[in-house]
Amino acid sequence: MNLIWIFPIAFCDAAEPWQLGFQDPATPMMQGIIDLHNDIFFFLIVILIFVLWMLVRALWHFHYKRNPIPERIVHGTTIEIIWTIFPSIILMFIAIPSFALLYSMDEVVDPAITIKAIGHQWYWTYEYSDYNSSDEQSLTFDSYMIPEDDLELGQLRLLEVDNRVVVPAKTHLRMIITSADVLHSWAVPSLGVKCDAVPGRLNQTSIFIKREGVYYGQCSELCGTNHGFMPIVVEAVSLDDYVSWVSNKLD
């Protein structure tokens, strides 16, 4: 039996109260986003310290009591060159890794599984188009949020659903995302995924989950009254457990 179902709170990646940082990365893409954030944060700290130092130095050395007669400066070629070149260099160091990460998000891979997510007001429909039942119908199900009164021990309020998206870990997945009514957004922070669901349009994104677990997300596009009540739950399991789950769903 799958231990994730026995101890649902032990293996989960979900938002926590007063959380300021990122959730633990479960995909190479999310790991890249966190690494890029840390690199940019380093530059921000250096710039902040430098600006504060210049500000304090100016307030100290150029106080009106120390310089009752201010010096008139109308042009400074050297300082203009410095404050043009240095920011350009910093922006270059930030842009190179960010562009590399951006292009890697659009990298096309040969997926083992394709899943279509359709946003509705206010639930999700999932279609596993690679599998057909005996009547030639693809594996399709709706995913609704579990009301607070129906939650079991260990389940998370406003985040748990009646039907999870079950996928195999360490497998290339392709998500095709669209909407049946208004704009939605399929977002799971631990997976580094946020893809808009647009009516009449198919958006796609690739996912490679490195470890087994349960990953929680929510619709991230204002879509009406119950926008905050259409969570997303992705459960990554072993390949054997995934095959068993698909077989049970098709029976």
UniProtKB/Swiss-Prot annotation:
Component of the cytochrome c oxidase (complex IV, CIV), a multisubunit enzyme composed of a catalytic core of 3 subunits and several supernumerary subunits. The complex exists as a monomer or a dimer and forms supercomplexes (SCs) in the inner mitochondrial membrane with ubiquinol-cytochrome c oxidoreductase (cytochrome b-c1 complex, complex III, CIII). Keywords: Copper, Electron transport, Magnesium, Membrane, Metal-binding, Mitochondrion, Mitochondrion inner membrane, Respiratory chain, Translocase, Transmembrane, Transmembrane helix, Transport. Mg(2+) binds at residue 221. NCBIfam families: CoxB (TIGR02866). The keyword Electron transport applies. Residues 1-39, 105-251 are mitochondrial intermembrane. Residues 61-75 are mitochondrial matrix. This is Cytochrome c oxidase subunit 2. Belongs to the cytochrome c oxidase subunit 2 family.
